[in-house]
Amino acid sequence: MRKTKLAVGLLCVMWAAQFAVAQIRTIEVLADKDSRYKIAGEKTPEIRVKAGESLLLRITARKAQSMSRDGSIHGFTLLHASDRSRVPGWDFTLKPGVQEFHVTAPSQPGEYVVVCTVICSDDHEGMNMKFVVEP
């Protein structure tokens, strides 16, 4: 009887661990033709995450005025707000349509900024968005 309870308990723990790993938050981003980032359901384009959180970025890119030679129409790069250095693993070029990226939020809490790295229009410099990592 004791072995049965132990086995059932172990199976429950294993199932719970698999379920916890499968829970990845999806963030819907629009890299729009007006050279602006937009977040589904939000008035202000800002992303807030927990340090080390697993994320699925689902980014829809719409063509602006121009594109790069490789067909990219926008970029999505995460920078440290303090010194504008790039965050490793957070540098994507976007082609028209929907693309998904599995990423892990930075482990260091603080303010970051998402910038477009493809010259997409005359207003390209305005294509940025606040990104906050909470403890």
Tell where the protein language model's regions lie, with residue ranges.
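Bacterial N-terminal signal peptides
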Residues: 8-17
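Bacterial N-terminal signal peptides that target proteins for export
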Residues: 1-8
